[in-house]
Amino acid sequence: KVTGLQNFGRYLSTIMELDAFLLNEDRHTNNIAVIRNEETGTFRLCPIFDHGLSFLADMNDYPIDADIYSYIRRVKSKPFCPDFTEQMEAATTLYGSDLHFLFSESDIPELFQCLDELYEPMILQRANHVIREQMCKYSHLFTT
């Protein structure tokens, strides 16, 4: 209770849920944080950050021209255990679940439209497939 924060467990659950959906393999204890106000000495939750290794983004570990389904099975979570679902379920069992996505499969083309000029078609296609797979796996995170 050093920070005085009452809802850190829910915050941690949200991080674990988001990381599971995004396949974020780079969560570590240095990017689970709180912010301290120097003037008042009070703490608040930090925005969730560092998703750079999500959706199989590491092209060295997950080359673009191979089977994404084997990659999805192979990617490991951090920092508490190597299985995303197990890690997420442990956190949500202890602290509850707050994460709910407000988009559906039919929204994906529009979400990707602004990325056409930034990424090669093969990269966008793979990200699209990964998102759809994760939507199926974690359908409970989506509001209908």
Name the predicted role of every residue range.
Residues 1-14, 18-24, 29, 33-144:
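Anionic ligand-binding catalytic core segments
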